[in-house]
Amino acid sequence: MTNRRNFLKTAGAAMLGAATAGRAAQGAVPEAPIQTSAAMQPPLAPPNGRPYSPVVTLNGWTLPWRMKDGVKEFHLVAEPVVREMAPGMKANLWGYNGQTPGPTIECVEGDKLRIFVTNKLPEHTTIHWHGILLPSGMDGVGGLTQPQIPVGKTYVYEFQMKKSGTFMYHPHADEMVQMAMG
């Protein structure tokens, strides 16, 4: 029979067991390495040119670019994508340049960018550049800061990277559908 005394004993034992298990788990966490030698220090900046190291992208693909009149030019194509999530399990998604997530756009602080976005989706779209300081007309909010990119048309985003960081981009048109599609 359950009474108050038995309930309190059981609850106390359970709390003691949980506290003990938590302490044991903390003891299993390895300590962070201490930088005691030059081998563990980050590499020095190159002696000439811009201090820059290419990133390793998770999806393994960085968007190619060309330099034209001091501006890095990139080309993105918003289009339907079929992605195999597991053997025999395919998903119909929307992405950029044949993949989802889209390719990494690699640049450094101070770079001037020109990004051509061609819409091959079945509806209008835009691109919103999360966290990037840029002119209002380049923010990607269709109908508010820029026109929507109609099906089959190309829109040119042009801005300068004013701060370094890792930022994401995504559609800002019919968001519930377009973000859900990838």
Give the location of each predicted region.
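N-terminal secretory signal peptides and thylakoid transit peptides that target proteins
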Residues: 1-15
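Intrinsic-disorder/low-complexity regions
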Residues: 2-5, 47, 110
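Generic recognition of flexible, low-complexity loop/linker segments
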Residues: 15, 62-63, 102-103
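Residue-level detector of secondary-structure transition/capping positions
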Residues: 15-16, 175
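Hydrophobic h-region of N-terminal signal peptides that target proteins for export
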Residues: 17-21
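C-terminal segment of N-terminal export signals and the immediately downstream linker at the start
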Residues: 22-70
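Histidine- and aromatic-enriched segments that form or immediately flank copper-ligand environments
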Residues: 73-182
